[in-house]
Design a protein with these regions (language model features):
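Helix-start/capping segments and mature chain N-termini
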Residues: 1-68, 73, 84, 89, ...
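ATP-grasp fold ATP-binding core
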Residues: 78-83
């Protein structure tokens, strides 16, 4: 089911700036027992992205009601929410554009995540590197061509996910997940002020770790540093947390961090 500006429909205007330029943002949430997991965090993410992209929106209460409406009818699955700047404007100009368009859809939960939680995921180093742009770093904007290319290369391997570097060689994230690795009692995750997406589950894990016996550090790290870890995990709002059993030729056997985070992230509300 799709809702576009509150109406059940599946077509979007060809002149909408989402289709013209990828001019907008989105978030993907897990539906558990008819409720949107971490609803307020997803709404805040969209608000922050719209502010960064200078998209004027005044429909946040209405949007949350629509999110709850679709979740109640899906029960368990995935909710995707997109916001575009709407129609209008000449060329790249945003003058006389809007109002903003909101697009909601639901889908089944990805079944392979259950298998990966039990077996652990394998990562392959992606040949595609992320561009660095502090104006867009952190937000989940609609321009995802880098991820499309990363996924296309990943599908030519036997790995489950891609480990992605930025254009300067810093470990950044995965194709559709964030990354953590543990060395002793210190947990590291890449800084995302120049590239990458600051995922909802990444934020949640950082808050959990800050209240634990672990020390959590956001770092700039090269691949060799990350590969010296005792343990590695990936996370996103749907997984929510999955242990990594191998990255290329490097294997990880410890699941200490995963066993701590997994039950806390499964029902985060």
């Amino acid at each position: 089911m799709f809702l576009i500006n509150g109406h059940k429909q599946e077509s979007l205007a060809a002149s909408d700036r989402a289709t013209q330029f990828g001019d907008g943002c989105f978030t993907t949430a897990r539906i558990i027992d008819g409720k949107v997991s971490l609803l307020s965090a997803h709404t805040q993410r969209l608000q922050e992205a719209c502010q960064r992209l200078m998209i004027a929106c005044d429909f946040w209460l209405q949007l949350e009601q629509e999110m709850k409406y679709l979740a109640a009818r899906q029960q368990n699955g995935v909710l995707k929410v997109m916001i575009s700047r709407g129609c209008g404007g000449r060329g790249y100009s945003t003058l006389n554009s809007g109002p903003a368009t909101r697009i909601l859809s639901v889908a089944a939960y990805p079944a392979h995540y259950d298998r990966l939680r039990n077996e652990g995921a394998t990562l392959a180093l992606s040949p595609i590197r992320l561009g660095r742009n502090p104006h867009l770093a952190g937000i989940k904007h609609l321009n995802r061509l880098e991820q499309v290319l990363i996924r296309s290369h990943l599908e030519q391997t036997n790995a489950d996910e891609a480990l992605v570097l930025d254009s300067e060689g810093w470990v950044t994230e995965c194709c559709a997940a964030n990354l953590f690795w543990r060395k002793g009692d210190v947990v590291y995750t890449p800084r995302l002020d120049q590239a990458g997406v600051n995922g909802i589950m990444r934020q949640f894990c950082i808050r959990l770790l800050a209240q634990s016996s672990y020390q959590v550090v956001e770092v700039q790290a090269v691949l060799e540093e990350a590969m010296q870890a005792d343990e590695m995990i990936v996370c996103n709002a749907l997984m929510p947390v999955i242990p990594v059993r191998a990255c290329g030729d490097i294997s990880f056997s410890s699941t200490t961090l995963y066993e701590y985070l997994a039950p806390l992230c499964e029902h985060p509300n």
